[in-house]
């Protein structure tokens, strides 16, 4: 499918974008979260646009196409974080676009609370460690694929993941002990 998109097939490109969008959005939500400007959905859209405009120059060098996509995603999320640092405005509450889901207000609140706690926990990590955990744990990439994206070796990715998960475990245990 990707080679056809690279060769200029609009239909193949549409299919590729439909396939990558959920994974890109999940990555953006884990890195950016909700209630901020730009939103995870905005950044995911920018990533898909960047993939669409650059796919013609993509060369298969033996690594998975998603490594190429996550490389673009990493850069776009980094740009969004920089923009958030410069933007001192306070956004208003956003209306969820996924209102078709049949969830009660209580379920929405619990889901948002869990996402916020996970995001706060991930924010205790360095940017590189957070990115490794998101790519390996949330997106299910291999150590090799993650290493390509973050510019490291697979061994260093495994070590960083182990240390990051240990740090998260320690932070979570400390939070649970203070809550008692």
What are these regions (language model features)?
Residues 42-49, 63-75:
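Structural recognition of an alpha-helix C-terminal capping motif at a helix-to-coil junction
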Residues 7-15, 25-46, 154, 178-180:
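Short, charged helix-capping/linker segments at alpha-helix termini
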Residues 95-123:
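Acidic, proline/glycine-rich intrinsically disordered inter-domain spacer in sigma factors
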Residues 23, 117-120, 130-131:
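Pre-recognition alpha-helix immediately N-terminal to the DNA-recognition helix
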Residues 30, 53-60, 71-92, 111:
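Arg/Lys-rich amphipathic alpha helix in sigma70-family domain 2
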Residues 132-136:
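A short pre-motif secondary-structure segment
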Residues 129, 144, 148-177:
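DNA-recognition helix of helix-turn-helix
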């Amino acid at each position: 499918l990707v080679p056809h998109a690279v060769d200029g097939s609009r239909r193949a490109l549409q299919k590729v974008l439909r396939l990558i969008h959920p994974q890109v959005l999940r990555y953006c939500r884990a890195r950016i979260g909700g209630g901020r400007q730009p939103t995870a959905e905005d950044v995911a859209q920018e990533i898909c646009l960047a993939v669409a405009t650059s796919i013609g120059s993509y060369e298969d060098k033996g690594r998975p196409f998603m490594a190429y996509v996550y490389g673009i995603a990493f850069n776009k999320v980094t740009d969004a974080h920089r923009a958030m640092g410069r933007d001192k405005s306070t956004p208003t509450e956003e209306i969820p676009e996924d209102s078709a889901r049949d969830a009660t207000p209580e379920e929405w609140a619990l889901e948002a609370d869990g996402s916020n706690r996970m995001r706060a926990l991930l924010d205790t990590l360095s940017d590189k460690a957070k990115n490794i955990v998101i790519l390996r744990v949330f997106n299910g990439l291999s150590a090799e694929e993650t290493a390509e994206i973050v510019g490291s070796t697979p061994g260093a990715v495994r070590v960083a993941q182990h240390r990051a998960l240990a740090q998260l475990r320690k932070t979570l245990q400390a939070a649970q002990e203070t809550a008692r």
